[in-house]
Amino acid sequence: MTASLPDKGQLNIPVADNRAEDLTARNTIEEGRTLARQDRWAKLSKMMHAADKDRAIASDATPIADLLAFGARSDVVLAVEHALSDGSALCEYDLLGGISELEDEMREHPSDPMITLVVALAHIDLAWAWRGTATDATLPPLHRSRCAAHFDRAADLLPTCRAALPDSPIVAAASCALLAGQRKTNQRVAEEYERLISLDPHNQRPMRAMGTHLLPRWFGSYEKLEVQALRNAARTGDIWGAGGYTWVQFDAIALDEEACARLDVEYFLEGLDDILHRRPDQQTVNMLSAYCAITIQNGQGLNEKADLVRSQIHEAANRLIRDHMTELHPLIWAHAANGFNNSVRINSAERFAARGKRDALRAIRDLFREELRSGTDVTFTPSGLRLSQH
């Protein structure tokens, strides 16, 4: 990708083609969906077991077992989401037919915890579908009762999975998802996440989720968030260094001004360096660079102390991009603008990626504005940054 202005320097940076990586995730979901449609539940279970045991992940760190399970229940969940959003009279078969069939499959495989897990996860998804985006005050009684019923059914099923698969990350993650859904003030939240992290310490996603759910708006407090971030750094120091602190705070400080204001920013920045030292791949480089350049700027101007922290983190984008970046990953930058919110619906992956590329190029041009204005070409190469006269 080359960008230039007349009589100015050029910005040259390769743009990664992430279609193959994205296709892998989509194909995994589709495989789970196909196996469920064909009633090949034994094979689905075997594949989920293998992926879970190997801690296999997609390029964005989503566990492969999660993708298979998502595909297997997607027809059921999407049918209910469509029925609830259609606006016409609700049909009980549309709302209950699919999950009843899943329950029947579970009863036909009573000794298979992975199939039970798929059913439990479907109930959690259906609970959220009924919950929607309404506030507690505006949630209709029917929606409230159905939401609670699905969460309760998931809570009934998960102990069987945990007893059969005590060392399974996907089962532990489901337990955390259930706690998040039930929204009960509970000391077990940090304990459940600690357990999940101990089962899969190389995956940052549970650490980030724990930080979010330890905010006061969920189950925790600012004090608990800081304590757990420090504890996580101590527990995972051999893998992440100070990065264990950074991952727990990563999404929390982007969401909450007070959490950001209270951050130990020097330790957070040390964690960024430790993460890149251990994960120097361009996926990670782009994610951390986009976070510092774009995500952390959201909410600027709402809290003076938080703004100071944000500016220090934002400045880190300079060295991350200059010292570590060799190629641009547009989808990562697009997600950064949404705060890496996985619930955001993407209608067109192409337009979403194009927006990410525009945001990234704007941020990088701004970073090198003096060099470009002076006629210097800025070129990113596999061996590092190269500056040359235009």
For the regions a language model picked out, list residue spans one by one.
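Detector for methionine-enriched segments
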Residues: 1, 47-48, 106, 114, ...
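Extreme N-terminal leader/anchor segments
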Residues: 1-97, 108, 321-390
